[in-house]
Structure formats: structure tokens, C-alpha cells
């Protein structure tokens, strides 16, 4: 069901758009104007399908999943939309005939700054799969004006600057002011009796903003389905107070405007201070309240009985950020729709499902009662009542067991615990990899699992092959299609048919030549952006992901320092040349993570400029890691660094993207690494380090002293001393003292070497040597790389979504008809 593409009509559409938008011809327009004109021409193709999809959903009155997420890391839209419309090559030809280069045009588009890490990219992959599989769904998030931040590296330091992605406009969004809703903050709750003697609650003396939706299309691959991502902007109720302005009170004149603007300014405002915490809670409630109001309004267009709302809608809560959904839905059902508590609870507990993404305590959000109750007074009353009823249940089920109440209560010790709220009120709780779900059930959420075993299930994460192979690695995609056909584009399990080619020497050479071409492409990117020459024949060893101590970028760079020491001591060391590639953003307030970035860059500066090692070791930190440069990186990688402390990474999806592009995993038995090794076999990955059970045992029982390793391992001692002797910072030898101290000394309640970097160091070094030995065997390496691709079928987000549909959402596929089909 591809698009019937008319080349001449498309060319005319581009030319007409330039004329209407800019009063220019193709020859006169600049690159950004060409991008806008081409995007609007592609949007024209989308519109018929988008309208047809929405009409079909309304006509068939379908059950719909609303995917609620603070982040949607969508990347660039133009190329993805053309791929999924199956017109990419047609449009490339049309533009060639106009004298325009599609690659240059695509590069004009900024990545949509609606997310940051794996959480947001997962949400984007899920939307892609839902549309491709034909399931009724839409995403709800926030239209951040500046995203998290744009990362610049200056003198080795991360500098955060606003990511002004909307400065030229977003051609793929449509503002929908007719679906705006008021969202209220603060004030107090007045209770009164209605004529039937029932308690009624009204929020008074509040401040409010208007949530205005912008719709973005989510195009399914080759099937006419176009779902929607709704991103909410905040506008003031009254834009400008002329009376205050005329009195000279200029701040008050624009106070309403600033209240609204602040909510949507940035993703994850720094919450190291009270104002930042308040802003985060405001953001969460803002998009949740608007999204529920929109869903209920849509429901009431075709249904009259609000008590059956859960038969048509299910909210999937992506991590704890949107879990206030539970209480806000209760509020709307009771205060605005007139249901009693039991009726509202029946609806709510059948339409809220929660995905847990972490066992890190810091990410299981808790809000101080004072803040929560002041900002959301009526919602807090409802949370209090949910907690009161649940604690009564606990007292009956576990009489006298105060420890259970402490762990499981929604409100305890002055805090509102959002994960507990989601579990108590949700009908489903899922982890995102087998190991992660096991840890939740046996450790972190053990008490809840014992009480509600039927709620818990696993849904191993996945990625969309359409972006990370078909679009990101066209050379490999074409090669695969030439071997097995193109069914893999919508059913990744077909990749297993490549296994018959892994021993074929001609196929091995073709495969490795494609890898080499992709390495040349990345080397060119690095030269243009970093000014560093890297050898495309070296091993490209890559770690790109959010910077966090548990992900252990520090272990990686300490090992690079160790390798450098070895090469300096023995210039004839028989190891292949290596290029270590990092890409990561650290949260603005996360000091040790930012210091780790500085360390990586200082080490790079020393190593890359040392002629004595003859270019056999290079270190590159790729600035402003994002979806669009990730596609280039994944395609070029030889080694995929997945080295989180075992038990800490819920799943990871970068590991899957590397695997799909033919990189070998070097990692711990953590997250989805466990399942990757199960699929590809232990011979085609290199695993090292403590197991999750061993890590948890050390954390619970103690028995690990990093100082012992420091005293007994000369290599480790040398590397750590280089952190504080000026080796990598002559002007300030103490620069990296905090990193040194974190590895060797307890600090308050924090244990030395919290993430077992020194404990795993020697095993990591040995694993590296083993990986390099594999690389020297060219045929063996080619076979392993090909097997990684052939065994990646399980890790499609299409498979993940089918499991969510089967076990949680219970949706039906919808077929959308459009008149211009082939």
C-alpha cells in the first residue's frame, strides 16, 4: 500500500511552496527555505492519510492507547516520513532533477528537542511501531522551546546552551487551539454540599495556564496509517495586563505570560533547588491534565457513559513522570463528570498502566508533601484518600507490619511516592528487560509483587529498524534486501535468514566493505566536527549514551589511560590501532558526570597529540550526541561498549542499535545485554565483570574495599595517581581529585567506588584484549558481526508493541483506505 508518487506534481509542490512561503524560486532560495518547502510538500502527501486515519478511528470507535511521556526523542522528521511513506528514493530523484541534494536538505533540519535519553527514544520507536502495525494510538508530551540543552564542548568542559530548535518553525506540526484546555495550580479547595447532599469540591484562588496542543504526524511504514504525537504548549490565560503596564508595573504586566512560558521552556530543569523541583512538578501535571481532558473530550464525541471510559482508552505511563495521571483522572471523573469514588476508581484502575524504567532510587520520584499539596491541592486530597484506603488494606493483610507500610504507602515520611501511586492504582506494572523485571519482583518492588503478582510483567525494549537500519545505514539495508528481500522492514525476525551467508567469504567481504564505508563516513564527520584525523582501519570502539556514573564512562576512559601507559612503555605492543569514541550529555547539575566529560576530553588532548604512539590510539568525544549523529555512529561501530554496573541498567536500547548494525557487544550481564548474548551466542560477544547477584550482595552485605585493589594492582594505582599528579591537567593537578576520591574514599552515606569500577577493571581490561584478539581474525570477526545482525530480530520495537497489545492494551489493528494507493 505504498504512495502513488507523481514526480512532476511533487516538483511543482516544492516550487509552489517556495513561492507562497518566501516569494522565491528554487534558484533564489537558501538551504533552510528549500528544507521548509520540501517538508511542506511531504506533509501534503501525509495529510490525506492523517485525515483518513482519524476518520477511520472515529467511525470504528476504536480502543486507543495514549502513550504519556515527558520525552519523545523523535530525531529529524523529514527523512523518517519519506522512508515510511516509501517515497524516499522517488523524492531523491525528483530533487536531483531540480538540482537539489537531499542529504544537504535533510541536514538543515534540527533534531526535535523533545527528549534526551533512552526513555525518549523508546517512546519515539514505540510510536513508529504502533503506526506501522496499524494500532490506534497517540503520544502526549510537552512542546519544549529549548529541549534539555544543546551541548558545546569548550576547553574540554560541557557548556549548556539553549537548543533553539523552533527558531525557523517546525513544518510538520499543526497548532490546534480549538482543543485547548485550562490547567490550574495552587489556591485552595472549597467543599460544599450539592442539592443531593453529596460533597462537591471546587479549587479557588488558583493560577492557571492554557494548554494548547500541536499535532505532529507519526507515519506508519507503507500502510496509510498516520497516528499523532500531541505536544502541549503553555499560553497565558490573559496575555498582557495593560492596566499594570500603564501603572509602570512592567513585571506584573507580563507575569501571566512568564508563568506559562516557564512551564515549557526546558526539559528536566535543574532540580537541585526548590524552584526547579516545583517547575518539574508543574510540567508533569500540566501535560497530564491537558492530555486527560483531551482524551475525555474525544471519548464523549462518540460515547455517552463516562463509566465505560476504560473500555476505549488506556494510558501507558512511561516512567514515574506522568504518574500523577492516576489522581488527575480521579479528580476529573469525580469533580467534573460527577462519578462517586468507587465508580471513578473502577475506571482509573482499569485504564492506567505503568512502565518502570529504573531501579535507581533517585529516579523513582518522590515529592515533598508541602510542595505537592500547595501546587496541586485537590489532587493531593485524592492522593491522600488513595493512600488512606491502601494503608487500611495493608493493615488488614499484614497486621502489625509497619515495615510493609513504610515501603508500600503512597505517602510516608513527608513524601508522596509516585511509583507506589502508579503500582497501587495501575492494572499493569512492567519492566523493560527480563533481568530488570526479575530484580523488580525479587528486590526493589518485592512487597508489591507479593501483593499484586498479577500486575507484573516483562516487556523487553526494542528499536525501530526503519530508522536505525533502513534510514541510518542504507548500504547495509540494501545489501540485506538483496540477500533476503525486504520483509525485514516490517518483520525483523526475517533477519535470521542471513545466517546461511555468515560463512560465505564473498558475503563476508561485502559486509566488511560496507562497514568500512560507514567508518569512512564517521571519520569524515569527526574530522569536520572535532578536527581529529582517525584511521578508518582502526577498531571503532564506541560508547554513546547519557552520562551517568552507573553507565561507567569512567571505567572506559580509565582503561584508555591504562592502554596509553602500556603503549608508552612498550611501543611495539602487538595490538590493532583503536579509536575510542564517546558521546554523552551530563545533566546540568551533575558535577561528577560533567567532570568525567572534562577528563575524557583532557585524555583525548594528550593522546591525540602524542607522536610517540604513532596514531595507534585516538580518543574522540562527539559533541551534542543526538539521534541524527547517532545513526552515523551506530553504522560505523565495531565494538559496542555496554558496561553498566550489573543490575543498574534496566534495559538499554543502544546495545540493540549497535547489534543491528553489526557491532560486537563488550559488556556486563546487565539489562538487555543478557538477552542479546542469549540470541547471538557467547562466542559473538565478550562479557565480563560482576553479575547482578554479586553486585546486590556487595551492596547489601559489604565486603568490598577498593583500597585493596589500589594497593595491590600497580596498573590501577598508576592510572588513579595520574588523576591527581597533573598528567592530564598540568595547570591544575587537582582537577580530577573528586573522581579519585569517589573511587577510594567513603563520603558521608556514599560508599567508595559505588559502581564497582575498580572491582571490574582487570576483568574489563582482559575482555578488551580478548575482543582485540577476535578482531585480528578477519574472517572470524566478519562472521561474528554478520551473526549479530542475523540474530537481532527479537529486538524490534514491533515485537515489543505486539506484546504490550497482547498483554496490556488489548487493541485491534485498523486498516486505513486512501484513494491514491497503487
Regions flagged by a language model, labelled:
Residues 1-822:
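A conserved ligand/cofactor-binding region detector
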